[in-house]
């Protein structure tokens, strides 16, 4: 009987070993599947992030180009503003000089109300085009960058 118990108990041990081995294999298989899924998810996430990086880089490049364009246009407009300010200042100086000259000369080309033959009244001199020597003050052509 002791032999029968050993045999029975030996086969129980073998059965337990076999079940444990099978359980370990199944656990290892689940672990491998879990690891594989994690790897696939990570690869998918990397791919997605790389795509987003590429899109953001392209967007950044487009914004940089637009910024450069706007900065160039802004520099041109600032230059044109300086030129126009100088032009207006020169025109104001010419008007002041011309007004002063007319005042000092007693009216210049304008005639007073008593000279009816000329047909020009006082004050009409401001409506007549002056031929001043200001060749350097030509209007600036449209400025494009």
UniProtKB/Swiss-Prot annotation:
Residues 46-53 are annotated as: Leucine-zipper. Disruption phenotype: Reduced requirement for exogenous sugar for seedling growth and higher rates of true leaf development. Keywords: Activator, DNA-binding, Nucleus, Transcription, Transcription regulation. GO terms for molecular function: DNA-binding transcription factor activity; protein heterodimerization activity; sequence-specific DNA binding; transcription cis-regulatory region binding. Residues 16-37 are annotated as: Basic motif. SUPFAM superfamilies: Leucine zipper domain (SSF57959). Induction: Reversibly repressed by glucose and mannose. Slowly induced by Pseudomonas syringae. Induced in roots upon cold and salt stress but then repressed in leaves. Promoted by low energy stress and dark-induced starvation. One of its GO terms (biological process) is response to osmotic stress. Residues 14-77 form the bZIP domain. It is found in: Nucleus. Residues 1-39 are annotated as: Disordered. InterPro entries: bZIP (IPR004827), bZIP_plant_GBF1 (IPR045314), bZIP_sf (IPR046347). Transmembrane segments: none annotated. It comes from the Eukaryota. GO terms for cellular component: nucleus. Residues 1-11 have a biased composition (Polar residues). It holds the Pfam family bZIP_2. Interacts with ZFP7, BZIP4, BZIP9, BZIP10, BZIP11, BZIP25, BZIP42, BZIP44, BZIP53, BZIP58 and BZIP63. Transcription factor that binds to the C-box-like motif (5'-TGCTGACGTCA-3') and G-box-like motif (5'-CCACGTGGCC-3'), ABRE elements, of gene promoters involved in sugar signaling. Activated by low energy stress both at transcriptional and post-transcriptional mechanisms. Promotes dark-induced senescence and participates in the transcriptional reprogramming of amino acid metabolism during the dark-induced starvation response. Transcription activator of the mannan synthase CSLA9. Recognizes and binds to DNA-specific sequence of CSLA9 promoter. Belongs to the bZIP family. This is Basic leucine zipper 1. The gene is BZIP1.
